[in-house]
């Protein structure tokens, strides 16, 4: 399995700013984001399940004011940060999880089907 660095682990703090990165998902370029919740890093495609559009109006701002839920800024859909499950608002299922690992102070995403590294 190929690992691609996303950011330094210290850049992600519980319930705060995310770190965006690019992936190919089924051959299509898509933004993804990594967040930390309860000390664990999670990552998802940056696509609301209500309408397939990016969720953040302000770059890297996904958490609500409490730092407990991921929100779509456009329509208010709310998702659990640890599972991506829809917990409220207009959504059709959960977020697509991107596999990540935290090793030696670095957060990596795991390049494996249906995800591919985006090469410019």
Predicted feature residues:
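A conserved acidic, glycine/proline-rich C-terminal tail/linker
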Residues: 85-86
């Amino acid at each position: 399995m190929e690992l691609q660095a996303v950011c330094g682990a210290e850049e992600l703090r519980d319930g705060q700013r995310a770190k965006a990165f690019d992936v190919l998902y089924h051959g299509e370029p898509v933004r993804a984001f990594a967040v930390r919740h309860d000390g664990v890093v999670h990552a998802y495609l940056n696509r609301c399940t209500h309408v397939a559009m990016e969720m953040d109006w302000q770059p890297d701002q996904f958490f609500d004011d409490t730092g407990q839920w991921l929100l779509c800024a456009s329509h208010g859909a709310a998702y659990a940060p640890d599972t991506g499950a829809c917990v409220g608002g207009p959504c059709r299922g959960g977020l697509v999880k991107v596999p990540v690992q935290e090793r030696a102070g670095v957060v990596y995403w795991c390049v494996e089907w249906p995800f591919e590294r985006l090469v410019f």
